[in-house]
Amino acid sequence: MSADLSKIQTVFFDLDGTLIDNFRAIYKCYADIAREMGLVPKSYHVLRATVGGSITMTLSKLIGEDLADEGVRRFRAHFPEVMFEDVFVLEGVEWILKNLRERGIRTAVFTNKEHASSVALLDYLKLSPLIDAVFGTNLPDMPWRKPQREYSEYVLEKMNLSAENAMLIGDSPFDVSAARTVGMPVACVATGTHLPEALIECTGSQEMIFPNMFALGHDLFKFIPHN
């Protein structure tokens, strides 16, 4: 879906694979709990391909549905101990966030990552001053996950927005579906879990697929290129 950028008041960003790379810590946490449960961890690349839906969905694929609940319990307990390991901000992220805010456009995180971990990571990476709101999961009043329509409606309502006044930038088909379920414009960066070909397949076009945030900011928003 193309966007009328003159109407955009807020840009929502996915977190993992879009703003930050936290995959090494996620893998370490998974591998640690898998070994605790007597399992042989699958490879880093296998894990990376499963991230995006929810931790329950990810662990169901990695350790099986029968063990997923126990795995989630262990993962949630262990992740705060390792979540800052090897985490970094992806290229162009600070640049695009600053440019959006200078243009008067609000920025928000819209993620399936748990809310507390999302806030802690944004604080640790010093991105919080560039973010107006954070929407994460595992909160009492927010039981949904992308791409459930209710979650997309929830973030729009909290930001007092209609879908045409917002845009979602992500890195996976979950993000595309989450935006489309409410008619929100969506763009993707190929810096996370899916290659450009997979993103083009799920969107049906390469028009809104970009290699990184620098390319997206320049080509879509016409920001001055980073030197």
Residue ranges and their predicted role:
Residues 10, 146-176:
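Conserved Lys-Pro-Asp/Glu-containing loop-to-beta segment of HAD-superfamily phosphomonoesterases
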Residues 3-6, 102-105, 159-165, 223-224:
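Glycine-rich phosphate-binding loop signature in dinucleotide/nucleotide-binding domains
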